[in-house]
């Protein structure tokens, strides 16, 4: 099986970049209280995580709901929710300290298409059957 190169990154709008930068800032601040991801500074979050999340965009469905299992600080789910307001995102994590911090970030970003749920993935799947 031949490994295919990643699709080219879509060019986000200025509004999307502004919102993603705000997300990076909020995540960096939350990281000081609750360890949500490894790097703490905004620039490292941007280059090591947010830009990587953007590579998923071409692979998303045209409609429906996307579930981010083990979302932690919202990577990639929150990033994708900013970029694709036409899709619904469920950000799932089993650790309440992480989901509480992430819910605050999502509320600050005013992302109506993102829902944060504190639940184990097995329980979430069983509840949706």
What does each model-identified segment do?
Residues 54-129:
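Conserved SAM/SAH cofactor-binding pocket of Class I
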Residues 1-67, 100, 104-114:
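Class I SAM-dependent transferase core
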């Amino acid at each position: 099986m031949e490994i295919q190169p990643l699709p080219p990154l879509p060019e986000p709008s200025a509004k999307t970049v502004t919102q993603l930068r705000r997300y990076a800032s909020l995540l960096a601040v939350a990281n000081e209280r609750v360890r949500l991801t490894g790097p703490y500074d905004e620039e490292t979050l941007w280059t090591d995580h947010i830009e990587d999340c953007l590579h998923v965009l071409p692979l998303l469905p045209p409609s429906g709901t996307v579930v981010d299992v083990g979302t932690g600080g919202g990577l990639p789910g929150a990033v994708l929710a900013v970029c694709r307001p036409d899709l619904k995102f469920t950000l799932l994590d089993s650790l309440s300290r992480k989901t509480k911090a992430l819910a605050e970030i999502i509320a600050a970003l005013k992302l109506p298409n993102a829902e944060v749920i504190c639940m184990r993935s097995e329980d979430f799947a069983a509840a949706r059957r």
